[in-house]
Amino acid sequence: MDLFRLGRLSPDVLGALAAAGWTPERKIDIKGWVEPLEAEGYRLHPLAEEVLARVGGLTIDPIRECGPNFANDEPYSFDPLAAGVGQRALAAEIEDLLGGQYFPVGEWLSYSSVFVEAGGRVVAAGMGWIWELGATFEESLQLAIGADRPLVCLHADDGLEPWPPTNLKSC
């Protein structure tokens, strides 16, 4: 089942995926990740299952380090345990604020945890902020690897200003 289509990505982002070890046929066993995360209370959904089977374990370097309003100088690492172990309360907060069912898939800037929602939305969260990576998994790859649009802060905890500001110029 193809719940997303990586062929829709820009050639540069596809090249970064390939350089990280991805191939169109790639499907790996994800049981070793899913069992400990389910033990913490996460519920695997079909999109998260496909994301992890297709790109789990990969670390993808950015192709553009200067986003419109953020420095994109860290890789997108698909390690669901690093993103999710001990972070179930964070996922529950995201679910309460945004609705939906979120499953951890990896880490991005400043080790923020990346979660994919059953309906497709991808967010990153950490340090009191929640950011929109994309309405689809493909959009999240374009942003996190290609820095092709501004990073949008969806939520800031009390006492924090949204980051990055929409008028911030990076790099």
For each predicted feature, which ranges?
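Short active-site-adjacent structural elements
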Residues: S113-F115, L133
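Broad hydrophobic/π-residue packing in well-ordered secondary structure
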Residues: A48-L52, V123, S140
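A surface-exposed partner-binding patch
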Residues: M1-S112, N167-C171
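Compact, glycine/acidic-enriched structural inserts
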Residues: G126-D158
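N-terminal functional modules and adjacent low-complexity/disordered segments of proteins
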Residues: D12, D73, V85, A89, ...
